[in-house]
Amino acid sequence: MTEKLNEIVVRKTKNVEDHVLDVIVLFNQGIDEVILKGTGREISKAVDVYNSLKDRLGDGVQLVNVQTGSEVRDRRRISYILLRLKRVY
């Protein structure tokens, strides 16, 4: 799976604050829209990352779109959530 430049895949090896820092770094690099992707058990962690971002940045971040679905990996269906975040100036 290739990761896009503005896509952050939430993984179990990193904690929530590390993912929040990754999003803030992307915003500071000039990227206006970031996609958070959480799969399986990391769906709740992706939502926690958004809530922590909202607490830190307040009205500086906006939730544009939420998409849920499932994908097939190794003949198993894995649920996912995509959170599209936009930097508001």
UniProtKB/Swiss-Prot annotation:
GO molecular function terms noted in the UniProt entry: double-stranded DNA binding; RNA binding
Subcellular location: Cytoplasm; Chromosome
Keyword DNA-binding attached: yes
Predominant localisation class: cytoplasm
Modified residues (N6-acetyllysine): K12
One Gene Ontology term, aspect cellular component: cytoplasm
GO terms under biological process: chromosome condensation
Superkingdom field: Archaea
Presence of keyword Cell inner membrane: no
Record: residues binding Zn(2+): K14, D18, D22
Protein keywords: Acetylation, Chromosome, Cytoplasm, DNA condensation, DNA-binding, RNA-binding, Zinc
Entry PTM: Acetylated. Acetylation at Lys-12 decreases DNA-binding affinity.
Pfam families in the cross-refs: Alba
Quaternary structure and partners: Forms homodimers and homotetramers. Homodimer at pH below 6.0. Forms homotetramers and higher order homooligomers at near the growth temperature of 80 degrees Celsius and pH 7.0. Interacts with Alba 1; heterodimers lack cooperative DNA-binding behavior and result in more compact chromatin structures compared to Alba 1 homodimers.
Family, per entry: Belongs to the histone-like Alba family.
Function: Binds single-stranded DNA, RNA and double-stranded DNA. Involved in DNA compaction.
Protein name: DNA/RNA-binding protein Alba 2
Provenance organism: Saccharolobus solfataricus (strain ATCC 35092 / DSM 1617 / JCM 11322 / P2) (Sulfolobus solfataricus)
Gene designation per UniProt: albA2
